[in-house]
Amino acid sequence: MNERQYAAAGVDLVSADQAKARIAVLVAGTRTDLSVGQVGAFGGMVRVPPGLRRPVLVLSTDGVGTKVLVALEAGRFDTVGEDLVNHSVNDILVHGATPVAFMDYVAGAGLTVQQIAGIVEGVARGCRQHEMALAGGETAQMPGLYQPGNFDLAGTIIGVVEEDQALHGDGIRPGDVLLGYQSTGLHTNGYTLARRIIFQQQQLQVGDRLGD
């Protein structure tokens, strides 16, 4: 099939190539001393950090849920990418793991090059903050499955921890001290309910201020 046939089916190969070129630059900017191989390969490769006696890999896959609808409403796409990374880091941190690499997945229809690049820019920024490589990912155009302009975002994180230092929760006992930290916000959870309260019940819009 040629570009014209793909375009008629709703897949823009020209824009896809432009997005890939911009993504490659962003990915290259996250490479660490553990990175192996070339940017754009079918599989992302990273070394296991040196000095570990019995390293255990800790993996987690997650998405940002309906927060993508807030991103679409606000017209800002980099923050959901960064949120995805931070959420994933938290998921493996509870097991005592240090993040090593990340893989992202963007699926949608009718997204512009700027929108796709914005999403991955946020992912790359989050990876740099945590000193881990964005080892690869996938950007899929799926007209017919997604409405034009809509998308979903997910990612997989890989971390590492010494086997005898991994946290499983099975050592928790009555009398242990529980430390709680104040959240900086909703992060990526609860947005279906939050959107209902804020946008439907309260009739607020993006840009409205709450309180003084």
Model-derived regions, located:
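Helix-biased detector of long, well-ordered alpha-helical tracts
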Residues: 1-212
